Amino acid sequence: MKILIISNHAYPAQGPRAFRTTELSEQLARMGHEVVLYTVLGKYDYAQYEKETGIQMRDIKPRFATSANDGTQRYNLFDKFMFHYFHRLLMWPQCEFHFIMDRIIKENPNMDVLITIAYPHSIHSGAARAKKKYPEIFPKTWICDCGDPFMLNPFFHSPKYMKRYEDMWCSMCDYIAVPTKESYKGYYQQYWKKIKVIPQGFDFSKTPVAEYKKNDVPTFLFMGSIYPGVRDPHSFMDYLLKFDKPYKFIMMMRTPLEERYVKESNGQIEYITGKGRKDVVWECSKADFLINVKNPSSVQTPSKLIDYGIAGRPVLDVENDFPDPTSFLKFYEGDYSGEHKIDFLDNYRIEHVAQQFLDLV
């Protein structure tokens, strides 16, 4: 089959949507399908990557300040002005994708399958716009893949007028792929019949783990994104500053939190930034246990739980306000009986995930 995939980010970019795009594209190509992947390439040389994977890499070519796979991003005075005043109102600069999809569909007529991957959701709405304009050349089956909801996202409130764009792509696509059963709640009920649960997929063979050895000092690790007041470890970290026993708490993220935690803990709290997913999982597998700051929303499940499952170390759930240290103290002493069980890890194998997409065609 000829498969067209459109996503903001892919290899070598880091992040859940980049991983989703990369793993899915590579697996579909391994299965013998012709895969054309449009993403924001930047200046990265994909010649060797195309040769190794068989994927045809194409550039979305946005004109404005959307970040590229290689981490580059135009951000001049005009971009700063537009982002400051119009990011919330227009979803600037990602709104540009809405108008680029026409060209991509015209460049790739009569494909068997189209998979559009959000964030941003303007990729979906742009594809809907292209389907209206060019129905005769539009791909036979269209799957909208959504890691997070849009209009009903509890973490981000979009302008009400954008509901018309969500209605447009939800009504025109064939399927909406979401990562968990709970994700249904992030979409308007009239579209639930289109929703298919397809979890995040990973090639486990590319993710080595260490042979665990108990650390001299109890060592626990957190990885992932932080949303102040929502998915927020500050209360837990404040507790650690007063904890009078030796420990090592490693936080792996894109950007560090306040340096005061490092200083006031005498280095017992440590930040590690800029590591790729493979390195992060390796570090997780060496920790005594892992910290999961619980997500108060049931419509979003942190993809880091999959990485935690691959790492194979016990997982401690921590509330935002950290009201009771009892569970932490048990983990500290090596009692992991209350761990967060990550079951059915095989469901996340990319071979199974890619087949679930193909089963929709």
Label each residue range with its predicted role.
Residues 169-195:
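A short, active-site helix/loop in glycosyltransferases that binds the activated sugar's phosphate group
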Residues 253, 258-281:
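Nucleotide-activated donor-binding/catalytic signature segment of Leloir-type glycosyltransferases, i.e.
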Residues 23-24, 122-125, 132-133, 144, ...:
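Membrane-proximal helix-turn-helix segments that form the acceptor-binding/catalytic region
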Residues 330-361:
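A charged, aromatic-enriched C-terminal amphipathic alpha-helix characteristic of glycosyltransferases
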Residues 138-143, 150-168, 204, 230:
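Nucleotide-sugar donor phosphate/pyrophosphate-binding loop at the beta->alpha transition
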Residues 182, 200-201:
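Carbohydrate-associated surface elements
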